[in-house]
Amino acid sequence: MRVLGKTLLPYHVNAWSLAVAEEVYRQKDLYKEQLETIIEQRDLMREQLEQMGLKIWPSATNFLTCCPQGELTARLAAACEQQYGSQGEKTQQMLAGMYLYRKLLEKKILVRDYTSHPVLQGCLRITVGLPLENAEIISRLQRLCGEEAI
């Protein structure tokens, strides 16, 4: 537990959480199949999101951080202003991310919104879930990044 404590120095993690993490690590073989599924799903989602025109940041976790790029950004930004009106002094990148976030939220799909973050403008963080959940998110994003954003 001392080794874990040293690596987490800048972040506060209580002793109980560290003890649970240590026990999970000791029994990592119990979670191997689940971890393999998450990794497979993450890689599949990365591929599908890139095909839609989204930039994906490298990830070794159970989530992907992504944002529209290129021509897709302009289309989504225009769709945002058309649907929601003028958004003030927001960049196209922010508008594109905001559009995706709001449209997903309308369908009760929750993602982490980083559209106003100074370094991750227009980005969303998508958690890798169960295969059916992932398929639903991908399907919805394909519609949003495709014909709906024209």
Q: What name fits each language-model region?
A:
Residues 1, 22, 131-138:
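Short, amphipathic alpha-helical "lid/cap" segments that border enzyme active or binding sites
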Residues 141:
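Hydrophobic "lid"/C-terminal helical patch
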Residues 20, 65-66, 120-121:
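Short secondary-structure capping/turn micro-motifs that flank functional sites
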Residues 38-43, 48-107, 124, 128-132:
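Conserved PLP-binding catalytic core of the aspartate aminotransferase-like
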